[in-house]
Amino acid sequence: LGFLERKRGMRPPLEPRALPSTVLAPDGSVRYFAYGSNLGRQKVLSRGAASIISTERANVAGWRLAFTFALNPPLEPSFASIEPAPAETVCEGVLHTLTPSAYEELWRSEGGGGSRPDYEEIVVLAKPWSGSEPVRAITLRAAQIRRLSHDVPPSQRYLSIVVAGAHEAGLSPAYIARLEAISAAAPSGFLAAVAEAHGLLLVLLYLLGLQRLLSPLRAICFLLHRHVRPRLRDIATGLLPPPPPRAAPS
């Protein structure tokens, strides 16, 4: 991870892009709706944002928190995304108001800036808890190349970050309880060791610009996750029968 942080520090600053005018405040700052690991202010700052102008809790109706961002099973099977849902469904989160340059740093830290971003930017209608009028905000949804057709349990490490951010933000007790009830991936010690070795290889390939060489292996892992034969599914999730996944909060 230190290698990656140093590599991030060597990157040239990004020029702010032209964003939809509806997500810009009168002073030109960007309204960004966070629902997953970016709920916590410190997490956003750690992504390169110099500062956060303001933060307030908000709801987005018609969308749900989903763990459909395909990553690297079995240690990190998925990250959070946001997916369409029935109109009565509410995704709780926070509105971070950022300078354009701070938002660009966050966007790049989430895989933006390249020819095939990991997330796509979408505009949602966020209703602040303060009672003020709903506002348009930009948020991130897993790009089609990363998007799974169903939720996959995230790692306990990642889920803990989301839950901690929800507590920090002061989201509703009922919503936090549903987050805490989500089953996390639990690979066996053997498979975890194999995956850690794979992770070190992935970091090395990333530094060399060759990370796409492992794409076929990642695809096989997700095929095993979805396989109807219990034996193959168990291999993919840690050689042990995985707990039945619980749905993300709606």
Regions found by a protein language model. Give the residues of each.
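Glycine-aromatic micro-motifs
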Residues: 2-250
